[in-house]
Design a protein with these regions (language model features):
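Conserved aromatic
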Residues: 40, 90, 113, 146-149
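ATP-binding N-terminal substructure of ATP-dependent carboxylate-amine bond-forming enzymes
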Residues: 1-86, 117
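Short acidic active-site motifs
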Residues: 45, 118-122, 151
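Glycine-rich beta-alpha junction loops
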Residues: 24, 136-138, 174-176
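Structural motif
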Residues: 58-61, 110-113, 173
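Conserved ATP-binding module of the ATP-grasp superfamily
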Residues: 106-109, 125, 129-132, 144-176
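A conserved helix-loop-beta module that forms one wall/lid of the active-site cleft
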Residues: 75-142
Length: 176
């Protein structure tokens, strides 16, 4: 629904619009010139499609998970866009927290992990409560607040269930 104004504006400007997504019922597909059933998180499949169609521009509207794919395709095809590595940093919570820390910017203590065991061994470095989050999800999906490490295993399972990469972060909870 949120993509509709952008698609309409592109068409007003005389641009040929092509949408792709794994959800064929998304309303933007109905007004685009073409639609392809390709997941916006599958960057290689979107790149292959973009090369086949010889596109000359790519954007991702109202979709955090699609932003890295759009940047990747633009970079690979020499199209205008944001640098892929920059977009990855902005959309993957562990990379973003590391970036903030490395550059001396305020942020809660956080660390990224791939396994429960790895995180469990590191819990002595955290002050509870903490938040457990998938690194690459949005809309608070898979986010769990825990009060001690006995709750970690269930929280990690929940976070990973929403992570495309299988990675998660643990970050200290900041009370306002």
């Amino acid at each position: 629904m949120q993509q509709i104004p952008s698609i309409k504006k592109a068409k007003e400007l005389g641009l040929y619009t092509i949408t792709c997504d794994y959800l064929p019922e998304n309303p933007g597909h109905k007004i685009a010139d073409e639609y392809y059933n390709v997941s916006t998180t599958d960057k290689e499949a979107v790149l292959q499609l973009a090369q086949k169609l010889q596109i000359d521009g790519i954007v991702a509207y109202a979709s955090d998970p699609a932003a890295p794919t759009a940047a990747y395709v633009a970079e690979k095809m020499g199209l205008p866009g944001n640098p892929y590595e920059s977009v990855k940093i902005l959309t993957e919570k562990d990379l973003f927290r590391d970036f903030l820390h490395k550059h001396g910017l305020n942020c809660p203590y956080a660390h990224g992990y791939t396994t429960y065991e790895e995180a469990y061994r590191d819990m002595e470095n955290f002050h509870f409560p903490v938040m457990v989050k998938p690194v690459d999800s949005s809309g608070s999906k898979g986010v769990v607040k825990i009060y001690d490490k006995s709750e970690l295993k269930a929280a990690v399972k929940e976070a990973i269930s929403y992570s495309r990469s299988g990675r998660f972060i643990v970050e200290e909870f900041i009370q306002k």
